[in-house]
């Protein structure tokens, strides 16, 4: 229920059946988005559950694609990168790419208030209780199987309000 209307419309335009899930239920609940996706895939002939949270191809795509591309576009002049984290594929892949090609790049997590990742990065403790947030696609209530946070130096908890205001400012000033 946090997916933008535009993404839903685009998926439907390409012929996809979109099943909206609840964001107020935890892992293990029958309506939890990952559990529901796995169940739909297992009950649908010919279906495949991509499982972005456990699929090693997710971080590999960023380790060998996104990371080198960022370094090329920046002519290797990169001091730090600030990112959000959902499945952790981008973060894990970038971390691996930069460890090899630009080990001095600092990785910084911008995490929604309510996600367990800020506390995990900053304090090393893993909370079993998460809050709720409205920002789409980032923040977690568990550590994804593919995650590797060892190179992330610091995390900042960002409110939904600040996130949405910053997104609007970037759109107005930078066109992104």
Task: For the regions a language model picked out, list residue spans one by one.
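Hydrophobic/small residue at the entry helix of a nucleotide-binding pocket
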Residues: 90
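Active-site/ligand-binding loops adjacent to catalytic centers
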Residues: 34, 46, 99-176
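Active-site-proximal loop->helix
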Residues: 1-40, 113, 117-126, 130, ...
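Surface-exposed amphipathic alpha-helices with a cationic face
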Residues: 12, 95-102
